[in-house]
Amino acid sequence: MAVHYNKILSAKAAVDCSIPVSVNASIKYADQQRREKLRKELARCEKEFKLSKSAMQTNSKMNSKFFVNSLQRPSGEPQDQDVLIEERLTRYPSFSKSLIPSPEGLHLSLPESNKILMNGTQKYPSTAPPRYSGCGHGYDRRPRSAHQFQVVISKTPSGDLLEKHADLFSNNQSPFTPRTLKTEAKSFLSQYRYYTPAKRRRDFSDQRMEAETQTELSSFNSELGTAEKKSSKDSDVSIKQAPNYMRNGAEDKIAPLSLQGQNLAWDKSKDGILQPSSERAPCTQFSPDSKIYSDEEELLYLSFMENVTDEILKLGLFSNRFLERLFERHIRKNKHHLEEGKMRYLLHGLKVDLGCISEEEQNSFRIFNEFHFQKALTSRENRFINDTEAVNHHERQQYQEALNMLSSVPKDENKMFSFPGEFLLPAHKVKHSEGVIVQQVNDETDFEALPWDGNNPSVSDSFIDQETSVDVIEGDSDFEMVETSRELCCLSTSLSPSVPLPSIEGGSNHDKELSTLKIMEMSIED
């Protein structure tokens, strides 16, 4: 049976009734336990305070009665009471301040130093021996004083803390301005797997201080020198056709626009083609003659390019899409204190150095960036020159087609041809006369030439609804036919200046006026 009872006593419950771990780790449960502990401590302190208060009252009564008895003049002491009182006051300096005259007699007020809770013998007055036992015969038989001493302990201090403790505060007149504490502490959430902490933006003043704390500009010359050597090898490509050329009116001289003040150096080769100079300045360097920005601003641009290149090298991506997004983000970040045009110019040069843009596109970009205004001024003149050349070419082509058509006359008399200009070649033979007459016949009899209009230089519509009858008179021999065709081919140069050019005035087709042109009239002699 003992074994049986031991098993019963040592048996454990099937359900775990112990305090769960979550309760011990709970903040709410810990606060509840702490509040309960504080309540118990407060109750114990109140009880001790009541006991100490009653003990302090009895001790104060004993001390006051003893002091009053000691102030009375004994029989064997001198008669001068003033001297005696001064000696007693100097002997007890703590009670000298507590003497307050009142109509009911001497009233002793407890000094401020005694307002604090008594410790040691004052807590337990029953065990403490009396301090002055020699004088206990008289005050026991005297009646108790009606005025008892009370300890006043102020729990809440009265008055303003800034006025009471002004020495502990500085600038008490300044208004309250809350400040954000900047620390290097990391968030607890940064330990989680799917949490991406916010990136801290670098202050502009810190970047400027870093730039100013650098050494002289000579420290950057080594890096710029290597970049200049690399870029000078790629810049030895000649620009065959530059868009900033102006063609002078009648002459064919090509003169480049002035490049002074544009920070671009050009050399003229032997063939007359302009080429960029071999010593091409890097994208972050400018000529000292046209230097606008100060040294501090140049350092800011250098730090801007340094941040861009550092981020590119850190991520290791060099695609065009990535670079465009990265450049735009840095431009938006620095556009408030840096010039956007210069930033784009520097970033474009960086793209060329990275190989994302060819050198030809770089040269065209620079030329467009520097001379877009001059190009806008000369575009109208170039357009007029191109239109004039197109008109002249079209005229020569039409005259050449007409001469080729007339020179290739078929031997068959019954054949008739219809050409795009509606030239009709009815061939009939007259034996008595030897000559070729080519005459253009128009419906109207007005032979006045229309004035030339520069706005409508095209003459392709001028030959519509015109009929040209060509009478070919052949001789008896084939030799005359061959000779006639040769003479017609030689007339190409003499026809072009003598024929006036018709034009179309106005925008409607109803205002067209057709002119009668005499193409040629000649007689072939033997």
Curated annotation (Swiss-Prot):
Compartment list: Cytoplasm, Cytoskeleton, Cilium axoneme; Cytoplasm, Cytoskeleton, Cilium basal body; Cytoplasm, Cytoskeleton; Cell projection, Cilium, Photoreceptor outer segment
Cytoplasm in keyword set: yes
Residue segments, region Disordered: 203-240
Function (record text): Involved in the maintenance of both rod and cone photoreceptor cells. Required for photoreceptor-specific localization of proximal connecting cilium (CC) proteins RPGR, AHI1, NPHP1, NPHP4, and RPGRIP1 at the distal CC, a photoreceptor-specific extension of the primary cilium transition zone. Maintenance of protein localization at the photoreceptor-specific distal CC is essential for normal microtubule stability and to prevent photoreceptor degeneration.
PANTHER family documented for this protein: SPERMATOGENESIS-ASSOCIATED PROTEIN 7
Bias kind Polar residues: ranges: 212-224
Organism of origin: Rattus norvegicus (Rat)
Keyword set includes Cytoplasm: yes
Protein name per UniProt: Spermatogenesis-associated protein 7 homolog
Pfam families: HSD3
Expressed in which tissues: In early prophase of primary spermatocytes.
Bias (Basic and acidic residues) ranges: 226-237
Keywords for the protein's UniProt record, in alphabetical order: Cell projection, Cytoplasm, Cytoskeleton
Subunit note: Found in a complex with CFAP410, NEK1 and SPATA7. Interacts with NEK1. Interacts with RPGRIP1. Interacts with RPGR. Interacts with NPHP4. Interacts with NPHP1. Interacts with AHI1.
Transmembrane segments: none
A Gene Ontology cellular-component term: axoneme
Main location: cytoplasm
GO biological process: microtubule cytoskeleton organization; photoreceptor cell maintenance; protein localization to photoreceptor connecting cilium; protein localization to photoreceptor outer segment; spermatogenesis
